[in-house]
Amino acid sequence: MRYPAMDFAFVLDPLPLLKAYKDSSVAMMRAVARRGHRVFAIEQPALYWRDGATRARAVPLTLHADDHDWYSAGAPEDRALKDFAAVMMRKDPPFDMEYVYSTYLLEAAEREGARVFNRPRAIRDYNEKFAIAAFRAFTAPTLVTRDAALIGAFIDEHGDAIVKPLDGMG
């Protein structure tokens, strides 16, 4: 059974910054396109709310297999987020105020009937790097701190460590 084509929106980083060969958002967009659906890219500055509706200047994409020239962009379309089959929040950190404001707009879109994946409140309230604290039985020795002395002592104790910012990519 063939279903009618649907429109999927992806809120993400600027397209030229995405590395198609390793970016999971690109893989998701390609999977959507392979199934005959339409893909739209939305950058954070393109999100807005007006007169009771969360909207965006959404850019339609044609996706290509070539990882270096992986998309062609059409002219931006002004669209209500609730009119998409799904809105995927795929923006990478930094977790700054623009990110927070984007989650507020996406939450408003949910209230208007949009289907937003990566729930705005959840990604705002639940830090992905600190989430491991809920699964202590499955983690290596872990330290979360901003204190350089504690980090040094932790490395001395364990020999090496992976150090990542809570609010950035890495």
Model features per residue range: what roles?
Residues 2-3, 7-34, 39-170:
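Active-site nucleotide/adenylate-binding loops and adjacent lid/helix of ATP-dependent enzymes
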